[in-house]
Design a protein with these regions (language model features):
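Acidic, Gly/Pro-rich loop/turn segments at junctions of secondary structure
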Residues: 1-21, 73-80
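Residue-level recognition of the GNAT/N-acetyltransferase active site
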Residues: 3-5, 27, 101-102
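Secondary-structure junction motif
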Residues: 8, 22-42, 106-114, 121-124
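Beta-alpha-beta core module
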Residues: 11-12, 56-105, 112
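Short beta-strand-to-loop elements that line the ligand-binding cleft
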Residues: 26, 45-54
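Conserved glycosyltransferase catalytic-site signature
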Residues: 32, 54-55
Length: 127
């Protein structure tokens, strides 16, 4: 995610090499987990200017030009910010899982959620 006037906003996709050395606004915990893993695996040395505890705050700071950030695509759908969202040129994905106790009498909400997730995963050919 970049500001609208950031040089990377002009590209259709962004490579890992493109973000090496860029100023970053990152969530405090994500740097140690998913984004940090992405950086380590691809030998990226970010210039972390700010660590933020809330994703939307990070996006607002990016909008104002404080740096760029890396966030899950699911979070970025229909966001109310004037930012540029670009995919990576290289393939990168994360695994999501649903864990629950398989006990009789699942709540209606959980039952509906599991049905939805299963249908969606099949439509996306994930299972």
């Amino acid at each position: 995610v970049t500001s609208l006037d950031h040089p990377l906003a002009d590209q259709l996709t962004v490579s890992f090499a493109d973000i090496d050395g860029q100023d970053f606004v990152l969530s405090a915990d994500d740097f140690d987990y998913e984004t940090g893993k992405l950086f380590r695996l691809n030998h990226i040395t970010p210039n972390v200017r700010f660590r933020i505890n809330e994703d939307y705050t990070a996006i607002k700071m990016v909008e104002q030009g404080f740096g760029i950030t890396v966030l899950p695509k699911l979070l970025l759908h229909n966001i109310p910010f004037n930012v540029c969202v670009r995919s990576f040129t290289e393939h990168f994905r994360r695994n999501l899982a649903v864990a629950y106790l398989d006990t009789p009498g699942l709540s209606p909400a959980l039952d509906k959620f599991l049905t939805f997730v299963t249908k969606w995963a099949k439509e996306c050919k994930l299972i």
